[in-house]
């Protein structure tokens, strides 16, 4: 597995606002404007509704809901581990087929998602399969986060189940 991009630590910045602006600029460069592809299919991001003049999708990469039942975007809390790893999102998408990565599909409600797991780094990126009105396929970047132990076990079972069902 190749080496992940360098983490962007908060410690080198004078304020949270400076840090947030820097990681947003990196998000725009490495994700939004990078023409990312996953399995030769474009990866797009959600912009609306914006929060604090930044794209909706950005917040789902760098923050988490304090309460899973609260869908108010303004109440999301920054997660420094997610923030530090903003460069890892594009890196995971473009390297998903390499050794050290696992990927598979799962169902979440009516949506088909793709989970990309940088296994030895315990970091996942979630994409949703979508189509345009003209039936053109694309992936929507949903979120990315560091795994906790209980989630690793759950994802391992899900991965094994997906690949077992593909063989049968």
What are these language model-derived features?
Residues 1-168:
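Ribonuclease/tRNase effector modules and their secretory precursors
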């Amino acid at each position: 597995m190749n080496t992940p991009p360098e983490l962007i630590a908060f410690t080198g910045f004078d304020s949270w606002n400076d840090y947030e602006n820097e990681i947003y600029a990196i998000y725009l460069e490495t994700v939004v404007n990078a023409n990312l592809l996953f399995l030769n299919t474009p990866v797009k991001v959600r912009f609306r509704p914006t929060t604090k003049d930044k794209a909706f999708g950005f917040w789902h990469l760098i923050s988490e809901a304090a309460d899973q039942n609260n869908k108010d975007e303004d109440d999301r809390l920054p997660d420094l581990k997610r923030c530090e790893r903003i460069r890892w999102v594009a890196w995971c998408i473009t390297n998903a087929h390499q050794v050290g990565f696992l990927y598979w599909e799962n169902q979440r409600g009516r949506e088909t998602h793709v989970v990309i797991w940088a296994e030895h780094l315990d970091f996942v990126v979630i994409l949703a399969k979508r189509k345009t009105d003209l039936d053109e396929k694309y992936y929507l970047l949903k979120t990315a986060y560091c795994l906790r132990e209980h989630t690793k076990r759950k994802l391992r079972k899900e991965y094994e189940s997906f690949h077992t069902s593909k063989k049968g």
